[in-house]
Amino acid sequence: SSAYGVPVILHLDHGDSVERCKHCIDNGFSSVMLDCSGEPYEENVRKVREVCEYAHRAGVVVGGEVMHPVEGKEKFVTAPEEALRYVEETGCDSLSVCCGNAHGMDPDYRKKLRVEEIAAIHALLPEMPLVLHATSVFDEAFIDRANRVGADRRQPFNFALEDLQATYSMGACKVNSALDIKILYTTAIREYMLRHPREMDPRKYLGYAREEIRRHIAGKHRNVFRDSGKSSLLDA
């Protein structure tokens, strides 16, 4: 943090148990998320509330996630009233919501970020930081690059970039994406090995992939998340 002049936190994402969250809290993590969204609502609330009570005594913030199953390929959604009740009953500090941002890539499902639902949640919880998972946005050229080295991927029907960016004024303070990074990392390694098939030094092809990822993430901060150069607005 001091070397780069920006504030840094240590966060546990998608914690899978109360015990793991407590272990991270005891070992210097700034923030933890307990993901019990696949469990019955009452059990989700009970576990996240327990972590919140433990974490808050240590000055650590906690993220929770709530949603319910629905028919169709969207699979899960978060209703505004459900979000309000969950925050009141758990005391969580941030809330992950599912409003069209499904995990994974389904080439047959045209994703649409339901901005109006996020706006409705924000209206009920105007001070609550909202978290969006599974927000990878990429174009046809991105998939074409992967396919040129054997990915055999169809162009996914991702939601529009402008819809994602619209949520930034609706409480979305933390935006997670991983699928694009996974695809690019694998693509870069394949590209390098096709050009250098006799290379056996992992430092070479991993170094190339790491630089591709660095450039990609820097571009996302500037053009997708629009948070580049804003660290001075935060309290260190």
Predicted regions and their residues:
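Alpha/beta enzyme core
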Residues: S2-G5, H14-P129, V137-F157, L161, ...
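C-terminal alpha-helical cap/extension of soluble enzyme domains
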Residues: R153, F159-A236
